[in-house]
């Protein structure tokens, strides 16, 4: 006899009671596995089994899920049951647990919820595979599993859910082919989102049978082959088709151009080619967005584009389009974005610029990028009549001549203006002063002349002003001091004269660079330069500057590059330059400097390049610090120098004669004895005072992290033996140790003599006390005590990371081939993904938002499985409502992070933000791909890591890629018939572009962590399955 639902419920409850509360979830799982009984009780058991399969149950989200009686599961969080008046009350019809912080696998038991219509588990941390049992949900209409870490393939059995209208499996780690069953059986599907996975193979032609489809997104996968022509048979109500960032090839089928309902169409970043049919846009009247960038399309822009009258974005950059730009844009009254850069467009005659007059009818135009083409001739005055909404205008890297339109100041909405690398002549129009919203003005490498207009001082929002390599003359305008948001100023290689205006150094925001080199500037360097405490680069070489080097340069604490060579400077080198602890390059050559070389320069540990040649220095050359390496210093042309290391080949210095007979030994000896007695008394008094406090308990503790004693740490580290020293920094030293509670640990002993070390200790404890993530270094315990001398002692004990830091792997110190470490490309991408996940957790998913403030390769530690863990939270900031919890003034807060990695806005005292971490992460991405530190000595002041990569992307990518990744870069890049090699190239290019996108100057322009993770997952999946050796190239991955 069949059992009733009530008896099933009672039996299940008795089973749970007999087993006991502690194993209730396991009991539910077992019961669900042993029975296929349906009904209300079956629904409850299926839900409890699902709960038991989770590793993390979302805190309070599933707290209500327990065996509480018939039908009570309908009150559980996320559970929706059918109405009581209906035929089947208490049956689960919806399970909605989006963003519930769940982790674990999706239990097959959910396949028993036979009345389920909607299942939404998106934006959690679920893993494992999609259970085929879900195909039993014959009533299912909505299945959303996006934003998890689900692996495996899409089960073909999903085709049995024939009532599905929405299927979203995006942002996971799915692999394999797209089942043809989706197209063959899911006739009611209106939404299909499979993007941002690792799906491969061809797009099934059966997808063309989805006659109800409205939203279709397969982007960011590894799909290959041609676009099926059957997709042109899709629903007449299809709104979006997104196929970007795959490996699709061939031409766009003509049938696609007949999808008259289409609103958005994207195929960018593929290998598609061919010409666009002349009538392609004839029926696409509703099209709003078309993105075909970074492909191999050629020919002309079809005139039929004018028929797409609703078009807002047209992006065809990075192709081989050529000829004259069409003049049909004037009918696109809703156009906001036009990307034509990096093509082969040309303008031979003045009438070829007619499309600009056409664009003046586009009153909503915001972005116009014509850079990197073959545009020539003179700009028409109609440029000044473009929309006042235009915020981005790029004409760089063309062959444009003539003058800049005098009324360009009419474009009052401009925020970015790129005119560099052309042949512009004449003067800068004074109307530029009307562009009050302008943030970036780049016009270097032209033939501009005349004086720099005073009206430039009206651009108070300007961040970047680069006018170098032109023919400007006259004085540097004093009105530049009005640019109170300026970060970088480049005026090099012009004919400027007069003094450097002292007002320039009152711009407190100037932090990236001042470059006034290679001009005819005169006078002295203003003392006010010391106001720029955050300045990184100062170039004033090759001028006619005279007078002394100002002592105040020593106040520019963040200065890394100082170039003053080829001037008329006199006097001695101020010893204050020794305060510039981050200085890497100092060039004072070819001046009239004299006196001794100050020994303080030897204390600058970062100084790798020092040029003092062709001056009149005298006396002994130091032998330590920068002076210990002859390859990094140049001192020729100073005839009166002596001493130094042997490699300098200088004469020995004559020792001074000592007159010991008249040396006042006795008075000095008595004074020393007295001083020592006083100091000893003070020491005993201080020690006694500290020991009286020893019994008082320390207030420094962390919930869940019991304190450990000083004596335990002494024992664990063999008395902090030098053999156990792992590394040392400004705030502390790290030792390897062994505690009873852990096999091996890392013990960070704070250097409390540094006043900032205690703040570092507090910040790290505060930031990590409630943090739990697989990619964060775990704190084992802490110690806040007194050492055996009565001094305060503080230490943090972490999990030991046996594989060392990422810095050790990217920049190994040893040159012994037998001891070289190698990270292949796939491993590097995995490490970057680990770090991105850690930052995503800190910024968005932790108990409270935390900004790390010091993301760099030495703070990324690797465990025995090479999983990356972000550590060293000594500079971290907890945010409350997006604002740093620890509010300090600019002067007291100082500079955050490490030179080279720190965001430029930190240099001007901005509050810590997640955008700053993203900038540092971007630099880390570039470092891990290029193998170069951001402070590499090969970089010039005008060519940092970002510029170095940008040049590589515009030229030969192999020139900037770490040589450890390429054994034969020439064959690799030119191996056009080798698909795996092309894919590796694409992955590296994508990584470099990601690094540049994350490290943009403007904080709000940087890529958010969620998008970073999506991009890295796509890159990682694109690398999977490649052969380890490519024909014509040997690569690691």
From Swiss-Prot:
Glycosites: 66, 101, 112, 209, 247, 258, 307, 334, 361, 385, 447, 458, 482, 495, 515, 592, 611
In this entry, the parts of the chain located on the Extracellular side of the membrane are 25-665
Ligand binding (ATP): 726-734, 748
Residues with the modification Phosphothreonine, per the entry, are 700, 717
Q: Where are the transmembrane segments?
A: 666-686
Tell me which Gene Ontology terms the entry assigns under biological process.
defense response
Q: What class of enzyme is it?
A: transferase
**Which parts of the chain are LRR repeats?**
89-112, 113-137, 138-161, 163-185, 187-210, 211-234, 236-259, 260-283, 285-308, 310-331, 333-355, 362-385, 387-411, 412-435, 437-459, 460-482, 483-507, 509-532, 533-556, 557-580, 581-604, 606-629
Recount the PTM note. Undergoes protein cleavage upon X.oryzae pv. oryzae protein Ax21 detection, thus releasing the processed protein kinase Xa21 chain.
Cytoplasmic face: residue ranges? 687-1037
According to the entry, every stretch annotated as the Protein kinase domain falls at: 720-1019
Name the cofactor(s) required for activity, per the record.
Mn(2+); Mg(2+)
Which Gene Ontology terms cover its molecular function? ATP binding; protein serine kinase activity; protein serine/threonine kinase activity
Give the matching InterPro entries. Answer: Kinase-like_dom_sf (IPR011009), Leu-rich_rpt (IPR001611), Leu-rich_rpt_typical-subtyp (IPR003591), LRR_dom_sf (IPR032675), LRR_N_plant-typ (IPR013210), Plant_receptor-like_S/T_kinase (IPR051809), Prot_kinase_dom (IPR000719), Protein_kinase_ATP_BS (IPR017441)
Q: What is this protein called?
A: Receptor kinase-like protein Xa21
């Amino acid at each position: 006899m069949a059992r009733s639902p009530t008896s099933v419920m009672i039996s299940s409850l008795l089973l749970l009671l007999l087993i006991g509360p502690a194993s209730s979830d396991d009991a539910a799982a077992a019961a669900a596995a042993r029975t296929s009984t349906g009904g209300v009780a079956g629904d409850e058991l299926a839900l409890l089994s699902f709960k038991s399969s989770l590793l993390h149950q979302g805190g309070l989200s599933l707290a209500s899920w327990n065996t509480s009686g018939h039908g009570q599961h309908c009150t559980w969080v996320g559970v929706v049951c059918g109405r009581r008046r209906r035929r089947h009350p208490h049956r689960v019809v919806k399970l909605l647990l989006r963003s519930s912080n769940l982790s674990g696998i999706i239990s097959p038991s959910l396949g028993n919820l036979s009345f389920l219509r909607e299942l939404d588990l998106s934006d959690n941390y679920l893993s494992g595979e999609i259970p085929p049992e879900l195909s039993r949900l014959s009533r299912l209409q909505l299945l959303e599993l996006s934003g998890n870490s689900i692996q495996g393939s899409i089960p073909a059995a999903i085709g049995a859910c024939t009532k599905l209208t929405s299927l979203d499996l995006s942002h996971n780690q799915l692999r394999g082919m797209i089942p043809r069953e989706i197209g063959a059986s899911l006739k009611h599907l209106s939404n299909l989102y499979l993007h941002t996975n690792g799906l491969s193979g061809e797009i099934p032609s059966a997808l063309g049978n989805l006659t109800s489809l409205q939203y279709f997104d397969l982007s960011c996968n590894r799909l290959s082959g041609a676009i099926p022509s059957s997709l042109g048979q899709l629903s007449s109500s299809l709104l979006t088709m997104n196929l970007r960032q795959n490996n699709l090839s061939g031409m766009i089928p003509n049938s696609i151009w007949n999808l008259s309902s289409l609103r958005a169409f994207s195929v960018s970043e593929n290998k598609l080619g061919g010409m666009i049919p002349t009538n392609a846009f004839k029926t696409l009247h509703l099209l709003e967005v078309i993105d075909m960038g970074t492909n191999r399309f050629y020919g002309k822009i079809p005139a039929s584009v004018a028929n797409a009258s609703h078009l807002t974005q047209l992006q065809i950059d990075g192709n081989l389009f050529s000829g004259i730009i069409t003049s049909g844009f004037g009918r696109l009254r809703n156009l906001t974005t036009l990307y034509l850069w990096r093509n082969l467009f040309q303008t031979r005659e003045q009438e070829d610029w007619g499309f600009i007059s056409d664009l003046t009818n586009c009153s909503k135009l915001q972005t116009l990028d014509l850079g990197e083409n073959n545009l020539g001739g003179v700009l028409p005055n109609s440029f000044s009549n473009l929309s006042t909404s235009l915020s981005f205008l790029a004409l760089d890297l063309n062959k444009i001549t003539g003058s800049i339109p005098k009324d360009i100041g009419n474009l009052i909405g401009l925020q970015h203006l790129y005119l560099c690398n052309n042949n512009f002549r004449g003067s800068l129009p004074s109307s530029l002063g009307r562009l009050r919203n302008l943030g970036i003005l780049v016009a270097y490498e032209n033939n501009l002349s005349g004086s720099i207009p005073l009206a430039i001082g009206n651009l108070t929002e300007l961040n970047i002003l680069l006018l170098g390599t032109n023919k400007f003359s006259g004085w540097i305008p004093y009105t530049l001091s009005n640019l109170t948001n300026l970060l970088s100023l480049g005026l090099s290689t012009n004919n400027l004269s007069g003094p450097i205006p002292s007002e320039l150094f009152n711009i407190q925001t100037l932090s990236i660079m001042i470059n006034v080199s290679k001009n005819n500037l005169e006078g002295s360097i203003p003392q006010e330069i010391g106001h720029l405490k955050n300045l990184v680069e100062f170039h004033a070489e090759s001028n006619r500057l005279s007078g002394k080097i100002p002592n105040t340069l020593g106040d520019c604490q963040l200065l890394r590059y100082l170039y003053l060579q080829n001037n008329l400077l006199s006097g001695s080198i101020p010893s204050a330059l020794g305060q510039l602890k981050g200085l890497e390059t100092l060039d004072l050559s070819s001046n009239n400097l004299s006196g001794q070389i100050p020994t303080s320069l030897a204390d600058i540990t970062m100084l790798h390049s020092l040029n003092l040649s062709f001056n009149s220095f005298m006396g002994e050359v130091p032998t330590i610090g920068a002076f210990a390496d002859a390859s990094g210093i140049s001192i020729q042309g100073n005839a009166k120098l002596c001493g130094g290391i042997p490699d300098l080949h200088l004469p020995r210095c004559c020792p001074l004669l000592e007159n010991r007979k008249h040396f006042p030994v006795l008075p000095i000896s008595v004074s020393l004895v007295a001083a020592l007695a006083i100091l000893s008394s003070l020491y005993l008094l201080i020690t006694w005072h500290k020991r009286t406090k020893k019994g008082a308990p320390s207030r420094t503790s962390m919930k869940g992290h019991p304190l450990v004693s000083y004596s335990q740490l002494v024992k664990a580290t063999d008395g902090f033996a030098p053999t156990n020293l792992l590394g040392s920094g400004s705030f502390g030293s790290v030792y390897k140790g062994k505690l009873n509670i852990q096999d091996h640990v890392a013990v960070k002993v704070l250097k409390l003599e540094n006043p900032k070390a205690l703040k570092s200790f507090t910040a790290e404890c505060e930031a990590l006390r409630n943090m739990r993530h697989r990619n964060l270094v775990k704190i084992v315990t802490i110690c806040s005590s007194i050492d055996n001398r009565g001094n305060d002692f503080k230490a943090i004990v972490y999990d030991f990371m046996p594989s060392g830091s990422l810095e050790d792997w990217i920049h190994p110190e040893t040159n012994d081939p037998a001891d070289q470490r190698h990270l292949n490309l796939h491993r590097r991408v995995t490490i970057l993904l680990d770090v991105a996940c850690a930052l995503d957790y800190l910024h968005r998913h932790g108990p409270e938002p935390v900004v790390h403030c010091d993301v760099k390769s030495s703070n990324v530690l690797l465990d025995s499985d090479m999983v990356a863990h972000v550590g060293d939270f000594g500079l971290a900031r907890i945010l409350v409502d997006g604002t740093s919890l620890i509010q300090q003034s600019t002067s007291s807060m100082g500079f955050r992070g490490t030179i080279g990695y720190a965001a430029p806005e930190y240099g001007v005292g901005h509050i810590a933000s997640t955008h700053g971490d993203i900038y540092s992460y971007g630099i880390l991405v570039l470092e891990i791909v290029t193998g170069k530190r951001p402070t590499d000595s090969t970089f010039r002041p005008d060519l940092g890591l970002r510029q170095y990569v940008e040049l590589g992307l515009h030229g030969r990518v192999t020139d900037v890629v770490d040589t450890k990744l390429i054994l034969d870069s020439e064959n690799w890049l030119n191996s056009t018939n080798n698909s795996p090699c092309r894919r590796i190239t694409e992955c590296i290019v994508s990584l470099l572009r990601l690094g540049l996108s994350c490290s943009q100057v403007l904080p709000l322009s940087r890529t958010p962590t969620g998008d970073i993770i999506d991009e890295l997952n796509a890159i990682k999946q694109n690398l999977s399955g490649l052969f380890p050796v490519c024909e014509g190239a040997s690569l690691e991955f």
